[in-house]
């Protein structure tokens, strides 16, 4: 049997919202595999599907710059939120975003080599690091292009902790921005159901079937219940099917359609998503309970 650490239990507990002993039991049953442990908890009805933003820790800000038919969404990281809120950091973030939208580099490495008044972008980041006393780094960016009959919607939440960029066809910029606000708030995974892979569908269907069987539902209605739960799940993760935050009587797709538009794409950044910081405040509590 795989040895289960307090850190693993803490991570699963944070992702799932399950109690300490339920998290430990799931990890034991899955031999320490975090994804399988999450599925185990879902099958038992203890946890829901984890959102993409479950593991967020790094500091920094995001920004969006739109120029004509090109837009760039950028994330710049720092070590503390104090530095991220400083004027030097915000200034270099805006410079970085403009530089990227103007030059369209292929990746972060190419972006760092872009020429600036002081040498290269990498030189500018080093200078900002020296000025702030913290490492300042370009983590990622995405360049988005649109056609003349399309509009960008750009929205920054909490001063740039979250950024959302959308493209809609036909509808105006205000509609596109409304959708961007929704994306920032709700965090969809996919544009619509056509983007969900068959593998993902079968995986979720299997989990819902186990969950339904564990509830003791009659065998003759299990499949119907499973498909109903799968349909609800898809309506929660696909932008087009989500209830629009500004008018829950409409889905996002129907809202855009009411403006004579069509959803084309979206991208959402949240500062530090997928990056973990060292955490110690809960570890001792978990160790104590694991050893009981």
From Swiss-Prot:
Keyword Cytoplasm: yes
Subcellular location: Cytoplasm
Involved in Mg(2+) ion dislocation from EF-Tu, as annotated region: 80-83
Keywords assigned: Cytoplasm, Elongation factor, Protein biosynthesis
Top-level taxon in the UniProt lineage: Bacteria
Function: Associates with the EF-Tu.GDP complex and induces the exchange of GDP to GTP. It remains bound to the aminoacyl-tRNA.EF-Tu.GTP complex up to the GTP hydrolysis stage on the ribosome.
Protein family per UniProt: Belongs to the EF-Ts family.
Protein name, per record: Elongation factor Ts
Organism for this UniProt entry: Limosilactobacillus fermentum (strain NBRC 3956 / LMG 18251) (Lactobacillus fermentum)
């Amino acid at each position: 049997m795989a040895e289960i650490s307090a850190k693993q239990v803490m991570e699963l507990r944070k992702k799932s919202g399950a109690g300490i002993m339920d998290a430990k039991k799931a990890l034991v049953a899955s031999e320490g595999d975090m994804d399988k442990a999450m599925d185990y908890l879902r099958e038992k009805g203890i946890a829901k599907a984890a959102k993409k933003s479950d593991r967020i820790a790094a500091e920094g800000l995001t920004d969006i710059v739109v120029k004509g038919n090109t837009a760039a969404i950028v994330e710049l990281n720092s070590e503390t939120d104090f530095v991220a809120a400083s004027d030097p950091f915000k200034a270099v973030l805006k410079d970085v975003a403009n530089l990227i939208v103007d030059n369209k580099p292929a990746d972060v490495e190419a972006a760092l080599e872009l020429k600036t008044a002081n040498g290269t972008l990498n030189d500018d980041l080093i200078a900002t690091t020296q000025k702030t006393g913290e490492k300042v780094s370009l983590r990622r960016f995405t360049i988005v292009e649109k056609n003349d009959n399309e509009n960008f919607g750009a929205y920054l939440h909490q001063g740039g902790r979250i950024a959302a960029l959308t493209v809609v066809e036909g509808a105006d910029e205000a509609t596109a921005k409304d959708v961007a606000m929704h994306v920032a708030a709700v965090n969809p995974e996919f544009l619509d159901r056509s983007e969900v892979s068959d593998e993902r569908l079968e995986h979720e269907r299997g989990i819902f079937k186990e969950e339904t069987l564990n509830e003791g539902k009659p065998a003759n209605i299990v499949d119907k219940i499973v498909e109903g739960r799968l349909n609800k799940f898809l309506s929660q993760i696909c932008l087009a099917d989500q209830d629009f935050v500004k008018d829950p009587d409409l889905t996002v797709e129907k809202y855009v359609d009411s403006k004579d538009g069509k959803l084309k794409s979206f991208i959402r950044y949240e500062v530090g998503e997928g990056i973990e910081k060292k955490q110690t405040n809960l570890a001792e509590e978990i160790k104590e309970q694991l050893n009981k």
